[in-house]
Structure formats: C-alpha cells, structure tokens
C-alpha cells in the first residue's frame, strides 16, 4: 500500500512538473490546427489527428520538463516557483532531465513513424527554440527573449495541421502569428506583478528592465497586434461575418484594459489585462473550430 502511494505521489509530482496549466493550451491549439486541416471525418484522418494530439502533448510536456530543468536554480530563488517539484526536491535532477529528454524525443519519433516529416521538423524547431534559444540562451540575457521564445508556443498549430495534411494554406500560419502575439501579452502582464521576484532571480524580464510606462506601452502594443491577427482570417475569406462579430466583441475589453494600463501602470491594471487575455486564445480557437466543423457537416 505504501509503495503504491509513493508511486502515485511520484507520478503526480512529474505531472505537476510538466506544467499541465501550460501544455494543455498548446495541445488544444494543435488540435484545432488538425481539425482545420481535415474536410471529412474519415478514419485515417482521425488517426492522424490523434497522432498529432499525442505528439503535441508529449512534445509540450518534454519541453516544459527541460526548461524547468534549466531554470531550476532560478526557480529555487523565486517565491512564486520555489515549491515546484524540482526545486522542492520532490523529484531528482536526473529524473527531471530524463523526463524532458524522453518525452521530447518521443514526440519527434512518433511523427517520423507516421512519415509526417514536415510536422517532425516543426516539432524539432519548436523544441530547439523553447529549450535552447529561449531558456538556455536568451531568458537571462535580454528582456525580449519571449518574442523569439514565442515561436515555440505557436508551432503546435503547424504541427497539428501538417500531421494531418501536406496541403499548404495561409490559415495555420496566420494562427501561428496570432499565438505569437498573444504570448508576450500573457507573459509580460503576469511578469509585471512578479517583477520583484524576477529581479531577485536575475532575470531581465521587460517589466524589470524598463519603466512602468514603457512596459505598459509594449504590452498594449502586443495586445493590438493580437487583435489584428485575430481579424485577419475574416478579411482573407477564411471565416464568415459571425467570426468577425465575436472577435470584435471579445476584443473590446482588451482595448479598454490596455488603454487603462497605459494611463495608470499598476499591478492591478496589469492583472486585469492578464486575467482577461488568458482565456482569449482559447475562445478564438474554439470559435474557429466550431465554424469549421459546421462547414464540414454541411
């Protein structure tokens, strides 16, 4: 009984270590990428969709595992992260590293088995960008690290699409950039609240390096670019007027919160923007999925 309990606790620790609150969204946007690529519910397409789902899940978990391994010293300093499984000692450094490596390699391997070579390339690029470019090279060196690191968070859309089809379309790339512009808004608005933590850990996040005013303007500019790439699919003819209407309604609070943040840069204003924009990407992709499924059924 004790062994079973210890085993379950260890599994739970590794699951928390993988940061499911982060990778579930990556898996979701990858799933939408796959759904957009299909025009029927044929069995082989559903199988490829499941392959993309598994690949994006294991790849995202692996990437989070490796970035957490790289950030272990920083996480042990920051109040917000010191109780995570690795800095708290729930899992070993060796176990954490192997967890990340095995899942990352598996995510590429499963795509290669099914001969999804372009999707495998995108998976490799996403992992390389997240683990090496963002976490290892840039995170502790520049406040703009999240911009280049944003590529990795957007790759699941392309992986989802190109696992299911080889057909070229602009829509997955538009959604790719939509995700890219959402990431700085999401990360920087939260970092504004915890900038003292980042300062103590020696991480030059944008809110740590720049003034309140410049930080607020930068975050708000990213918010406007996010809205722009949200409406582009309509003007390119990918979705109907209903999509545009919903996006415009969802975007109004972003504009209001962004303007208020610029007028009065405070932690409260930053968190309002963070709390509202956090589910924004999920809403947009969910709308896209519903519209496309309706089109397939027709």
Curated annotation (Swiss-Prot):
Species the sequence originates in = Picrophilus torridus (strain ATCC 700027 / DSM 9790 / JCM 10055 / NBRC 100828 / KAW 2/3)
Q: Quote the catalytic activity from the record.
A: heme b + (2E,6E)-farnesyl diphosphate + H2O = Fe(II)-heme o + diphosphate
**Known HAMAP family for this protein?**
CyoE_CtaB
Topology within the bilayer: Multi-pass membrane protein
User: Which family would the database say this protein is a member of?
Assistant: Belongs to the UbiA prenyltransferase family. Protoheme IX farnesyltransferase subfamily.
Signal as a keyword? Answer: no
Q: Which UniProt keywords apply?
A: Cell membrane, Heme biosynthesis, Membrane, Transferase, Transmembrane, Transmembrane helix
GO MF, one annotated term: protoheme IX farnesyltransferase activity
Where found, per UniProt?
Cell membrane
Q: What does this protein do?
A: Converts heme B (protoheme IX) to heme O by substitution of the vinyl group on carbon 2 of heme B porphyrin ring with a hydroxyethyl farnesyl side group.
Q: What is this protein called?
A: Protoheme IX farnesyltransferase 1
Q: What else is known?
A: Carbon 2 of the heme B porphyrin ring is defined according to the Fischer nomenclature.
Q: Name one GO biological process term.
A: heme O biosynthetic process
State the top-level EC class: transferase
User: Could you tell me which PANTHER family the record lists for this protein?
Assistant: PROTOHEME IX FARNESYLTRANSFERASE, MITOCHONDRIAL (PTHR43448:SF2)
Fetch the NCBIfam families from UniProt. cyoE_ctaB (TIGR01473), PRK04375.1-2 (NF003349)
Q: Give, as in the UniProt entry, the pathway in which the protein acts.
A: Porphyrin-containing compound metabolism; heme O biosynthesis; heme O from protoheme: step 1/1
Q: Name one GO cellular component term.
A: plasma membrane
């Amino acid at each position: 009984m004790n062994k079973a309990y210890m085993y379950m606790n260890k599994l739970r620790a590794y699951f928390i270590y993988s940061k499911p609150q982060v990778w579930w969204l990556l898996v979701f946007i990858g799933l939408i990428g796959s759904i957009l690529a299909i025009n029927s519910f044929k069995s082989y397409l559903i199988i490829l969709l499941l392959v993309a789902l598994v690949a994006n899940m294991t790849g995202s978990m692996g990437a989070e595992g490796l970035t957490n391994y790289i950030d272990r010293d920083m996480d042990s300093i920051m109040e917000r992260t010191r109780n995570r499984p690795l800095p708290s000692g729930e899992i070993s450094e060796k176990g954490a590293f192997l967890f990340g490596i095995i899942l990352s390699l598996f995510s590429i391997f499963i795509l290669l088995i099914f001969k999804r070579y372009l999707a495998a390339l995108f998976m490799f690029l996403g992992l390389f960008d997240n683990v090496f470019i963002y976490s290892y090279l840039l995170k502790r060196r520049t406040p703009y690290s999240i911009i280049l690191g944003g590529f990795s968070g957007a790759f699941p859309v392309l992986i989802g699409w190109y696992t299911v089809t080889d057909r070229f379309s602009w829509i997955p790339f538009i959604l790719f950039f939509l995700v890219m512009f959402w990431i700085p808004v999401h990360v920087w608005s939260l970092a504004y609240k915890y900038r003292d933590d980042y300062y103590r850990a020696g991480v030059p996040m944008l809110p740590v390096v720049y003034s309140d005013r410049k930080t607020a303007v930068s975050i708000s500019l990213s918010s406007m670019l996010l809205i722009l790439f949200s409406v582009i699919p309509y003007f390119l003819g990918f979705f109907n007027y209903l999509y545009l209407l919903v996006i415009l309604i969802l975007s109004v609070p972003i504009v209001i919160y962004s303007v208020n943040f610029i007028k009065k840069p405070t932690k409260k204003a930053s968190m309002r923007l963070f709390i509202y924009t956090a589910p924004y990407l999920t809403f947009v992709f969910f709308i896209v999925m519903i519209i496309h499924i309706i089109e397939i059924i027709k």
